[in-house]
Amino acid sequence: MDSKEVSEVPRREVRSFLMARDPSIDRRFRPRPNKKMRLFDNIQESEEESFSEYSDTESEYKYQSSEATEGASCATSAADSSNVETGPQVFLRLRPVKDASKAYIVSEEANVLITSCKVDSTSNNVNRMEKHFGFTSIFDSTVGQRDIYDTCVGPKIMEEECVTIMTYGTSGSGKTYTLLGDDVRAGIIPRALENIFTIYQDTVFRSPKLKLINGSIVFLQDDASLKELQIRKKLLDLCPDISAHHQRLKQVIDGDHMFETKASTDVSVLVWVSFVEIYNELVYDLLAIPPKQDKLGEVPRKNLKIVGNKGHVFIKGLTSVFVTSSEEALRLLRLGQQRSTYASTSVNANSSRSHCVFTVDILKYNRSGITTQSSYKFCDLAGSERVNNTGTSGLRLKEAKNINTSLMVLGRCLDAASTVQKKKNADIIPYRDSKLTMLLQAALLGKEKLAMIVTVTPLDKYYEENLNVLNFASIAKNIIFKEPVIKQHRVSYCGFMEFSKMSTCEGGDYTKELEDENVRLQLEIEQLKYDHVLQMQLLEEKLRRELTATYQEIIQNNKKQYEDECEKKLLIAQRESEFMLSSQRRRYEEQIEDLKDEIEELKNPASDTDISDDPNESKSPIEILDDD
């Protein structure tokens, strides 16, 4: 009887060291603190809330809406604007599928995803439990690219703050589509480029006078500016022609958004773009100018080095290209896409095998001499994969290992960042363990804004992979950073314009100085116009002389050739006429000789004595007719 009762008691799952769990990037099996600390006293908890041992955000976001979170952050900002603490925004996007699984349910507030697997799509009993994952916002399959941009990216560009935007998810879940879109539905990168150049339409400077070099803004001399323009021209010549495609995208974007132009005459804006790829923990420049090679074959790519200097992280030797329009930036983006590494797997026919980071740096120069920098990083992270499901081997297996390793390090960094605010002796964020985290350490350390767009395919066969992705996102949602400081630099000299310094004397008339400066600049403009006209006239006269000399030389050559041809034809005609005359003369002489012989025969006397044998022959005398 006792043995029967013991057998009916369910056994607790015992973790085995012989058959370990599948390694992944999630942190759901790490130990949890038993003691909980109440952060907000004003939030009323429901009596129905139940905390789970294995859920990261099961009840923390179940009854809390996004409006309450925003209200708390606004109150904190009003209390102390210098020490504002905010966390990264984490968005969830569900890919449209034909038969969506019922294991994924979105709450009415559209900020909590409830997962509960009721089929045999997972081998772990813990994964079958109902879990609640909180997000800043959740986009279902009906939400388009316009709403995603307006929610995730548009406000940050209008606020002119540095931001890193990452797309994370499994292979084939729509990460690249969210960033780039297609020919009809533009992604967030084309929309962001169009938004940036519309905002600064009247202030975009046409010459590369400032550049971000090794994390610092540097003034470029004329020869350096000319070199940057040559690099820009070479790369644009290599880019595909997308004029018609850009016009279609522009029409779509203009129809979806009403971007406004900022009117500012005191600021000059320069835009630089760069594109980098992290493949097998090696950093490659996707906008590098290909070297000239004598032999045929693939050109080996150069591995770049990530360097940190005084808190600034940069890639040594990375090509940064100066652009003046959204079309130029989009052409460079397409060029980098063609050079990035793609391969086919059993999950995705065109799977990205590397992490790609497209950066847009905006440098603004104020007439007071202060420059500000705004950087927008768009990171297309490679999809996390399970080797058993993808069936990779060889090179694909090596790529999958490196991808999962870098994503695991990213998860460790996010986990460490989330515990920094909770513990006094927190672990150091291990951003040096991966090239990806080294490049994104500014966002991981809270120096820049961080936004993550998590993409999920709501199907039962991807349930375990989606749980790993959701657990990864829940770690990022718990991070709290202080408000980043806007980067400002001061330059001693600028080539945009020479501003007159304000008089240090008391009572100095600054308006009078500006008027004098305006008059001086107008006179300088007139002088430049006069010099330009004079140079054009001299150049025109020089060209006229060169053209006249060239045409005269051509005419003389043609005349000489014509005279030579006429001489040859005349000589040939003369020879032909002489030959005809000589032949005709010989013929006439022969005829004359023949006639003379006949005359001699007729005048011969012996011919008179010849008597005809015919008696009837007439005996009339022969008459000799003279030609005369």
UniProtKB/Swiss-Prot annotation:
Listed GO biological process terms: embryonic cleavage; female meiosis chromosome segregation; gamma-tubulin complex localization; male meiotic nuclear division; meiotic spindle midzone assembly; meiotic spindle organization; metaphase/anaphase transition of mitotic cell cycle; microtubule nucleation
Any coiled-coil regions, as ranges: 509-612
Outcome when changing E385K: In allele sub-Dub; meiotic non-disjunction in males and females
Gene Ontology cellular component list: cytoplasm; kinesin complex; meiotic spindle midzone; microtubule; microtubule associated complex; nucleus; spindle midzone; spindle pole
Residues in Kinesin motor domain copies: 87-479
MF annotations from Gene Ontology: ATP binding; ATP hydrolysis activity; gamma-tubulin complex binding; microtubule binding; microtubule motor activity
Alphabetic keyword roster: ATP-binding, Cell cycle, Cell division, Coiled coil, Cytoplasm, Cytoskeleton, Meiosis, Microtubule, Mitosis, Motor protein, Nucleotide-binding, Phosphoprotein
Major location category of this protein: cytoplasm
InterPro entries recorded: Kinesin-like_fam, Kinesin_motor_CS, Kinesin_motor_dom, Kinesin_motor_dom_sf, P-loop_NTPase
Amino acids binding ATP: G169, T170, S171, G172, S173, G174, K175, T176
Renumbered residue ranges of the record's region Disordered: 28-68, 596-628
Record-listed Phosphoserine modification sites: S607, S612
Localization, UniProt: Cytoplasm; Cytoplasm, Cytoskeleton
PTM sites of type Phosphothreonine: T609
Family statement drawn from the similarity comment of this UniProt entry: Belongs to the TRAFAC class myosin-kinesin ATPase superfamily. Kinesin family.
Function according to Swiss-Prot or TrEMBL: Required during female meiosis for bipolar spindle formation in the absence of the centrosomes and chromosome homolog segregation. Also has roles in male meiosis and mitotic divisions of the early embryo.
Name recorded for this polypeptide: Kinesin-like protein subito
